[in-house]
Curated annotation (Swiss-Prot):
It comes from the Bacteria. GO terms for biological process: translation. GO terms for molecular function: rRNA binding; structural constituent of ribosome. One of its GO terms (cellular component) is cytosolic large ribosomal subunit. One of the early assembly proteins it binds 23S rRNA. One of the proteins that surrounds the polypeptide exit tunnel on the outside of the ribosome. Forms the main docking site for trigger factor binding to the ribosome. Part of the 50S ribosomal subunit. Contacts protein L29, and trigger factor when it is bound to the ribosome. It holds the Pfam family Ribosomal_L23. It comes from Listeria monocytogenes serovar 1/2a (strain ATCC BAA-679 / EGD-e). Belongs to the universal ribosomal protein uL23 family. This is Large ribosomal subunit protein uL23. Disulfide bonds: none annotated. Keywords: Ribonucleoprotein, Ribosomal protein, RNA-binding, rRNA-binding.
Length: 94
């Protein structure tokens, strides 16, 4: 997989913006991506050194449309911690 295929989008929530001070950045990633692939993708795209990657999997939620039921897509979220000497990712500047 290409680095741009692994990292889908940043996750911007109140919780994710509060941990930016600790140099932790939150991304939605491909469901098949491993921690190592996420690390290399972030290092390649943003030119930073990654110290740690934490990953969470979310199941799809049940949604109904009248009598028809289905599920939303499952998601995978990664919290990437960069090293102290790395520059800040400008993507998240507020």
């Amino acid at each position: 997989m290409d680095a741009r295929d692994i990292i889908k989008r940043p996750v911007v929530t109140e919780e994710s913006t509060s941990i930016l001070d600790d140099k932790k950045y939150t991304f939605e990633v491909d469901t098949r991506a491993t921690k190592t692939q996420v690390k290399y993708a972030v290092e390649e795209i943003f030119d930073v050194k990654v110290a740690k990657v934490n990953v969470m999997n979310y199941k799809g939620k049940l949604k109904r449309m009248g009598r028809y039921a289905g599920y939303t897509n499952k998601r995978r979220k990664a919290i990437v911690t960069v090293t102290a000497d790395s520059k800040e990712i400008q993507f998240f500047e507020v």
